[in-house]
């Protein structure tokens, strides 16, 4: 399943990020990908050795960790350190699949269940630059407002189309979920959404408490901690 998570960053946060990224050190984006991805990747990334990068990636982690919708959809166990990329002058990233595992500075290795892109450029400011994701439901073309995030299975083939005008800047990361199976995770997300909707409409009740108990028992049964 693919999820649109709006307002992960406020407009003020986005403006501050963009101002700081104007001063960042950018390097060839192929340094963080494998041999297959490097053949189709043509973009730039913020140098992860810089002091500015350390500060910005911490801010992204704080923002996603505080977002209730992100947590409900991803049920994250481990988040990778966020990276930042930039596309301009017809730069693109052809169809590829993300690696199944990635190194993690604290955990050694993590499984990539979900991929996330946090858009930092207004969609009207550039042409092209769509994230195209192929999954079992078809092809999705994604170009979201700055500050919004898209979450999709890392097993999906995806690409970024050439940016023919302007500059597309984004942050991206991977998530190991407590729930490995996409279908089970989607069912828990739907159940959680329905519980919250019923609570807001009718208040607390024995039936809602029973559904909440069901949610947590399923989470207990399926989760890998």
From Swiss-Prot:
Keywords: Dioxygenase, Iron, Metal-binding, Oxidoreductase, Vitamin C. 2-oxoglutarate binds at residue 168. InterPro entries: Oxoglu/Fe-dep_dioxygenase_dom (IPR005123), PKHD_C (IPR041097), PKHD_hydroxylase (IPR023550), Pro_4_hyd_alph (IPR006620), Pro_4_hyd_alph_FE2OG_OXY (IPR044862). Residues 78-177 form the Fe2OG dioxygenase domain. GO terms for biological process: DNA damage response; intracellular iron ion homeostasis. It comes from the Bacteria. Disulfide bonds: none annotated. Binds 1 Fe(2+) ion per subunit. Fe cation binds at residues 96, 98, 158. This is PKHD-type hydroxylase YbiX. It comes from Escherichia coli (strain 55989 / EAEC). The lineage of its organism: Bacteria, Pseudomonadati, Pseudomonadota, Gammaproteobacteria, Enterobacterales. The gene is ybiX.
